Amino acid sequence: MMQTNLQLDLAFNYLENTGTNIFLTGKAGTGKTTFLKKLKETSPKRMIVVAPTGVAAINAGGVTIHSFFQLPFGPYIPGSEMASGQNKSYSHKFSRDKINIIRSMDLLVIDEVSMVRADLLDAISDMLRRYRDRNRSEERRVGKECRS
């Protein structure tokens, strides 16, 4: 039987009942992965789980950030031709299905967020702003930090 963790229960209830962001961190073995599994199994929210590496994505039951957002592996420079969609060598076009997934998503979980470069977070933010309803005040994100 799984032991109850009051802090994780509080975080779960907070996520379920608010639309605000949380940053979940903790040492190895504190229940972060169990929390994510419980969240995926029991939450009615439509969520996407991404991670910076293939191994982290598999462990979280998600996909890589680059795969989901169709990002190149080089650095992302806000305001650049790539960011504005003017770079002909990098045509950023999501399928209608992908756009619908992004627009209908209630929760974006970024597992192992401490491994994500700042420019990649900018790219994610820009993609969400571009494809989601612009009337929403914030994208809803959850980051689970990697600590060994």
Range-by-range predicted roles:
Residues 1-148:
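Conserved ATP-binding/catalytic motifs of P-loop helicase motor domains
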